[in-house]
Regions:
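Intrinsically disordered, low-complexity acidic regions
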Residues: 213, 218, 234-237, 247-250, ...
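Residues at the starts of beta-strands that form the adenosine-phosphate
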Residues: 203, 235, 302-303
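Alpha-helical cap/lid subdomain in secreted, periplasmic
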Residues: 6, 89, 249-383
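Bacterial N-terminal signal peptides
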Residues: 12-21
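N-terminal secretory targeting modules
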Residues: 2-8, 24-203, 378-383
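Short helix-loop-beta junction
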Residues: 225-238, 329
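Surface-exposed cleft-lining segments at the edges of enzyme active sites
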Residues: 210-215, 237-243, 269-282
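Catalytic nucleophile-elbow at a beta strand-turn-alpha helix junction centered on a G-D-S/GDSL motif
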Residues: 201-225
C-alpha cells in the first residue's frame, strides 16, 4: 500500500506539471465522457481557456484565504482596521509569469468590486491588467498592452504572441478579481518560468499606504512595487492598504508568516504622531517599535528597509520621520544588522509634476519612487 500511495502522489505531481499540454486530449475525451474533463480548462471557439488558479502566480502570499486572490489570510481579526480587511481583496502586486508556445494570447477577467475607477485614477489602473514580454537582447521586461475595462461584468482582450517568449501579466491594483482566465491555442502548452538570474526567489514584501498600494498610476505595471520587481528581477508581495497602513501588532504577525527576502516598511503617511497631537491607536510612537521588533524576532535574518514619509510635495520635516530616524539609530546602536534607512529626499524629483493631486504619484512619480526604493532593496539584498 505504501508504494501505491507514493505512485499516486507521483502521478498527481506529473499531472499538475503537464496540465495544459494534455488539455486538448482531455477535452476531446470530455465530448464523450464529461467525467473526464480537466477541471479549470475549457476549449471553446478555438481557444483553450485556463483558469488563473492553475497558472504560475506571484505576489500571493497566503493559502488560507477567503477568496483565492486575497492578499491576506481569512483569519485577520478586528484588531486590524477595517480598511485592511476590505482591501485585502485587491490584487495589487499579483502577477502571472509563464512561457507558452501559443501564437496568440487571450485574457478575460471579472472584477471583484463594481466600482472600476476613481476620480484621480483611471479604470486601467484600478481594475485593468497589463502585459509584458521579456526581451532577451536587453534583458528587460517590455510593456506590450493594457487590458482596459468598462463593464463591471468583466473584460476580455486578445494579442498576438511570439511563441517561446516569457510573459508577465499584472493584475488590478485597486480592485480584485473574482475570475481570471488565460486563453491559448488548443494544442499550446503553458509552463512556469525558470529560476531568476538575480538568484532571489523569496519575495520582497512591501507594507504601506495608498502609494505602496499603487495609487495613482495609469496601469498596474507602473506601480513602483511592480517596477522594482521587474528592474531587480525579484518577486514582490504588495501589502499596501490605502489609508490603512498603521502597523498594528497583528500585521507584524502576518508579515512574519511570509518567507521573505526583505521587508520594506512604508506606513508613515497613514500614521499620526503623539508629538503632533495624534490620537492613540494609529501613531508611530505606539505602533512602530513593537511592530519592527516582533518582525525581527520572528525573522531575525531578513533585511528590513525603514522608509521615511515621502512628503516632499506635502510638507517638510515632521515628527514621524524624526521618530523613526531616532529608532533606527537606537536599533543600530543595539547591534541590529541588515537594517536600511531610506530618507524621503531620495524619493521624488522635487516638484509637483510627478503627482495627480499634490501627493499621490502619477507614472512619472512612480518611476522616481521605484528608483529610490529599488536602490534601498538592492542595498538590503546585496545586489
Amino acid at each position: 500500500m505504501a508504494n501505491g500511495k507514493k505512485l499516486a502522489v507521483r502521478l498527481v505531481a506529473c499531472a499538475a506539471a503537464v496540465f495544459v499540454a494534455g488539455a486538448a486530449f482531455a477535452n476531446d475525451i470530455a465530448k464523450y465522457d464529461k467525467n473526464m474533463a480537466v477541471e479549470g480548462i475549457v476549449v471553446t471557439n478555438g481557444i483553450k481557456w485556463v483558469d488563473g488558479k492553475l497558472l504560475p502566480i506571484e505576489g500571493r502570499a497566503f493559502n488560507d484565504v477567503e477568496h483565492y486572490y486575497d492578499r491576506l489570510p481569512a483569519g485577520v481579526t478586528t484588531n486590524v482596521n477595517g480598511g485592511v480587511r476590505s482591501m485585502k481583496h485587491h490584487t495589487s502586486g499579483m502577477q502571472f509569469r509563464f512561457v507558452t508556445d501559443s501564437k496568440k494570447l487571450s485574457f478575460k477577467w471579472v472584477p471583484y468590486n463594481q466600482s472600476l475607477a476613481m476620480d484621480h485614477m483611471p479604470a486601467s489602473g484600478v481594475s485593468g491588467i497589463d502585459v509584458y514580454r521579456f526581451d532577451a537582447k536587453s534583458g528587460r521586461w517590455l510593456y506590450v498592452k493594457t487590458g482596459r475595462i468598462t463593464n463591471a461584468k468583466g473584460a476580455q482582450m486578445q494579442i498576438p504572441w511570439t511563441p517561446g517568449t516569457p510573459c508577465l501579466v499584472n493584475l488590478p491594483l485597486y480592485n480584485g478579481v473574482k475570475e481570471f482566465s488565460l486563453g491559448v491555442e488548443p494544442n499550446a502548452t503553458v509552463s512556469a518560468l525558470g529560476p531568476r538570474k538575480s538568484g532571489i526567489d523569496k519575495p520582497v514584501v512591501f507594507y504601506g499606504t495608498s502609494i505602496t498600494h499603487g495609487g495613482c498610476c495609469s496601469r498596474p505595471g507602473m506601480a513602483f512595487v511592480n517596477i522594482v520587481g521587474r528592474d531587480l528581477d525579484v518577486p514582490v508581495v504588495n501589502l499596501g492598504f490605502s489609508g490603512s497602513g498603521v502597523m498594528e501588532f497583528e500585521m507584524s504577525e502576518h508579515l512574519a508568516r511570509i518567507d521573505a527576502s526583505c521587508y520594506v516598511l512604508d506606513c508613515l503617511w497613514n500614521m499620526g504622531s503623539l508629538a503632533s497631537g495624534a490620537s492613540k491607536g494609529r501613531n508611530v510612537e505606539e505602533n512602530y517599535e513593537p511592530f519592527i521588533r516582533n518582525l525581527r524576532a520572528k525573522r531575525p535574518d531578513v533585511p528590513i528597509v525603514m522608509a521615511e514619509m515621502c512628503d516632499v510635495y506635502c510638507g517638510g520635516p515632521n515628527a514621524k520621520d524624526k521618530y523613526i530616524k531616532q529608532l533606527y539609530d537606537k536599533l543600530v546602536a543595539e547591534g541590529w544588522k541588515n537594517l536600511v534607512y531610506l530618507p524621503k529626499d531620495d524619493m521624488y524629483t522635487g516638484d509637483l509634476e510627478g503627482t495627480v493631486d499634490g501627493c499621490h504619484p502619477n507614472d512619472w512619480g512612480m518611476m522616481s519612487l521605484a528608483r529610490a526604493f529599488g536602490g534601498a532593496v538592492r542595498k538590503a539584498l546585496g545586489l
